[in-house]
């Protein structure tokens, strides 16, 4: 019973995201914030680890308003994940569903990339390495530089020296 309610809420949020995409694309910050808080109200995202980090409204708006993440995600990162599609045949529907969500919650995805989340061990290396692969020039490099430092400090303070060491190595 609880699972069916959760899936209904998740489907409603998915519809809301696409509604925002088509009708509110010209006012991205308002539209995205509206979608997020509506989804949060339904409670569907409270159980998904990749959405939990969006709590700071200023952080959310500042990430979205830069426009940097949108352009990079749509060109490089999205195609990177599409190239791995054959690995996710069994979980195909869920994989693309979550990927669609991430396209509209880029701050969460960005913090995932920079290793700022308390991820499972198998994700730590990917979370540290992806920024170096995809954000390696110009403005984006400065952007990455700042957040790698921030992620490293957070990981050191959370007593995870191994991951912090990885970031140090990748950051050189």
Swiss-Prot record:
This is Uncharacterized protein MPN_103.
């Amino acid at each position: 019973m609880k699972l069916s309610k959760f899936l209904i809420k998740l489907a409603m949020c998915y519809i809301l995201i696409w509604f925002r995409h088509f009708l509110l694309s010209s006012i991205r910050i308002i539209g995205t914030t509206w979608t997020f808080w509506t989804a949060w109200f339904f409670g569907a995202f409270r159980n998904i680890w990749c959405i939990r980090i969006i709590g700071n409204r200023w952080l959310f708006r500042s990430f979205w308003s830069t426009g940097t993440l949108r352009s990079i995600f749509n060109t490089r990162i999205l195609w990177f994940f599409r190239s791995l599609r054959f690995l996710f045949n069994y979980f195909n529907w869920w994989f693309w569903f979550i990927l669609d969500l991430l396209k509209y919650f880029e701050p969460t995805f960005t913090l995932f990339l920079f290793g700022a989340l308390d991820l499972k061990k198998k994700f730590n290396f990917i979370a540290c390495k992806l920024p170096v692969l995809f954000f390696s020039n110009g403005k984006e490099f400065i952007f990455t530089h700042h957040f790698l430092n921030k992620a490293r400090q957070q990981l050191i303070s959370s007593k995870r020296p191994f991951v912090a060491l990885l970031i140090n190595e990748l950051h050189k």
